[in-house]
Every structure is written in structure tokens, then in C-alpha cells.
Regions:
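Juxtamembrane helix-capping/reentrant segments at transmembrane boundaries
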Residues: 28, 86, 90-103, 152-156
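Alpha-helical transmembrane segments
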Residues: 258-272
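Topogenic membrane-insertion module of multi-pass membrane proteins
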Residues: 1-80, 201-217, 223, 278-282, ...
Length: 338
């Protein structure tokens, strides 16, 4: 295992302002004894609580828009609190970095889900394509980190996107705001496509920007992109309920991203995406032709991917268990920051 050192370049245009006026003042209210990982876990609970709540809600109201915006705002705040807490208490660790950044992968997908629900956009092909683009942006970020040994966040990234989503959600608390986003403004297309178009463009810029810094096209990322796109394409062709491709694509990306993160800390060769994805595609298409239950195949593959993620996660927790603490020591007793 490599000696740990958090190496990150963050050029976010909003981060300095948010740190000055929101994150830093609010962080002063957090007791220094609370471990940074607990703050990360709280942000995860906020997002998954909101996700589960909306899964069980069909009719939405202004209150739902406010609650979704509140959950996402809380996630953003505590997602930055953990890093600030680790820095102030000199408790930065590989466990904390992986827990923080890997949870962002799935929390980001939940943000997209909540945004689509609040805007009352069908959870169909457009939703799944946006989910996949988000996965690509996250994946290339950590593939680049493994190669360059540096994590890079550009001027317009996930933080800016999430702040925009919060603003959109708040506007939908007023019926006229929701009506505005659903009103056709160009070629008969609704205004919310401006948001989706901007998000899609930012994902592409993230990928191409990474290629420019690497001065190469990482083979494993290209294979991940092609295979995952084929997997998503088959799901769209079969017109499945959104939940099945959402889970399969999310876990497929999550497995690859976690392997890439492992490569950063364990100095492994560039990981390849799961090799069973192609076989699943080949198995599903004949099932559709012979009118067999292809959903079972996809669900089984999703469960397999989840078990892979759990296995890798358990290995990481076991390896870095020394960094887990239930309460931070006093500042004068804290270990030196590496």
C-alpha cells in the first residue's frame, strides 16, 4: 500500500464563496470530537433517506420540492464538513477519502433522480442517459487520479451542478416556477432541457478535459464506456421499467469506479470493467427473441455487481480499519497529518 497523501486540485468557481459564507461559519458549530467519517455518513443518510421517501411518494407538492432541496443542501454542507473536519483535526486518511468520494457516486445519482421527480419528468430513456453520463464523468475522474496520482476538479463541476439543482428545486416550490420549466420555449421543447443540456455538456467537458491532461485515451475507460453504453442500449431497447437499468448501470459503474479507487491506494494496474457485461448482453437478446424472462438475467447481474462492490468495500474497510475512530482525540493528542 502506498503512503497516504491527499493530493487534490479543486478549481471550482463556487467553492471559495461557499467556504467563506456557508461552510466555514457553519463548521464552527461542529464539535471537533466528531470524526470526519461520521459527517460523511450523515450526508449519506440524508440522501438515501430522501431517495427512499420519494420512491414511496407518487403525488408531489410544494413541500416535497422544499424537502428535496433541503436534503440536497444538507448533503452538500456535510459533504464538505467531513474534509474540513479531517483537516482541522489532522485526521485525513485513505478510508475517509474513499468513503467521501465513493459515496458521492451514488449520492450524485440520487440528486439526478430527485431533480427529475421535482420537475415531473418521466423516468424514461432521457433519465437513464443522464444517469449514464454522470457515471462516465465520475469514472474518468478516478481513472485519471489513478494514472496521475492527483484528483482534479474543474471550474464547473459537480458542486456547481448540485447548487443549480437546489435552485431549480426551490423554484418548483411555486407552481409558476414548475410551470416555467415545463413550458416549451424553443422548437416546442420544454425549458428544463436547458438544464439537462447544460449538465450533459459538463459531463462531456469533464471527459475530454481528462483526456487532455492525460494526453491519452485510457483503454480501460474506453472499454468501460463502450460496454456500459451497450448494456444501457439493450435496456432501453427492451423498454424496461426504469428501476432495473438504473440499478444495473449504477452498480456496473460503481464496481469499476471502486476498482479505480483501489488502484490509487494499492498501486495496482489499471483495472478493467466487469467482463460479464458483454455476456449479459448476449444472454438477454436471445431471451427477448424467444420471449423468455430477460429481467431475471439483468436482476441477477445487478445482484452480482452489488456483491462485488460489497466484497471490495469490505476489503477496504478491513485494510484501513485503523483509521476508524469513534471520537477524535484532543487536538494536542491528534496524530500528525500526512
Amino acid at each position: 500500500m502506498n503512503e497516504y497523501h491527499y493530493n487534490c486540485v479543486d478549481e471550482s468557481v463556487l467553492l471559495p464563496l461557499l467556504e467563506k459564507y456557508i461552510f466555514t461559519p457553519l463548521h464552527k458549530l461542529v464539535p471537533l470530537g466528531i470524526p470526519a467519517n461520521f459527517l460523511t455518513l450523515f450526508s449519506i443518510v440524508l440522501m438515501w433517506g430522501g431517495f427512499i421517501s420519494f420512491l414511496n411518494t407518487k403525488e408531489l407538492s410544494a413541500g416535497h420540492a422544499l424537502s428535496a432541496a433541503g436534503a440536497v443542501f444538507g448533503y452538500v454542507v456535510f459533504d464538505h464538513f467531513d474534509g474540513m473536519q479531517a483537516k482541522v483535526t489532522s485526521t485525513s486518511s485513505p478510508l475517509g477519502e474513499i468513503l467521501d468520494h465513493y459515496s458521492d457516486v451514488f449520492n450524485g445519482l440520487i440528486v439526478i433522480y430527485l431533480c427529475f421527480r421535482i420537475l415531473e419528468i418521466e423516468l424514461g430513456a432521457l433519465f437513464l442517459v443522464i444517469i449514464w453520463l454522470n457515471c462516465l464523468a465520475f469514472a474518468v475522474t478516478y481513472v485519471e487520479q489513478q494514472i496521475r496520482k492527483q484528483l482534479y476538479f474543474g471550474p464547473i463541476g459537480s458542486l456547481e451542478g448540485v447548487i443549480l439543482v437546489i435552485a431549480v428545486m426551490l423554484s418548483c416550490a411555486n407552481p409558476s416556477g414548475l410551470q416555467f420549466w415545463q413550458t416549451p420555449i424553443l422548437l416546442g421543447q420544454p425549458a428544463y432541457l436547458l438544464i439537462i443540456g447544460g449538465f450533459s455538456a459538463s459531463c462531456f467537458f469533464t471527459v475530454f478535459g481528462s483526456f487532455q491532461r492525460l494526453e491519452a485515451l485510457p483503454r480501460n475507460f474506453i472499454e468501460f464506456t463502450l460496454t456500459g453504453s451497450l448494456l444501457l442500449g439493450v435496456c432501453l431497447y427492451l423498454r424496461l421499467h426504469w428501476a432495473i437499468p438504473f440499478l444495473v448501470v449504477s452498480f456496473y459503474a460503481g464496481d469499476f469506479i471502486l476498482k479505480s479507487m483501489q488502484g490509487v491506494f494499492f498501486d495496482r494496474i489499471q483495472p478493467l470493467p466487469d467482463r460479464f457485461a458483454g455476456l449479459v448482453v448476449l444472454a438477454v437478446l436471445p431471451c427477448e427473441f424467444f420471449e423468455l424472462d430477460y429481467e431475471v438475467v439483468l436482476l441477477a447481474y445487478g445482484i452480482y455487481l452489488l456483491l462485488q462492490i460489497v466484497s471490495r468495500g469490505t476489503h477496504i474497510l478491513t485494510t484501513f480499519k485503523e483509521y476508524w475512530v469513534w471520537w477524535n482525540p484532543p487536538p494536542d493528542c491528534a496524530p500528525p497529518k500526512t
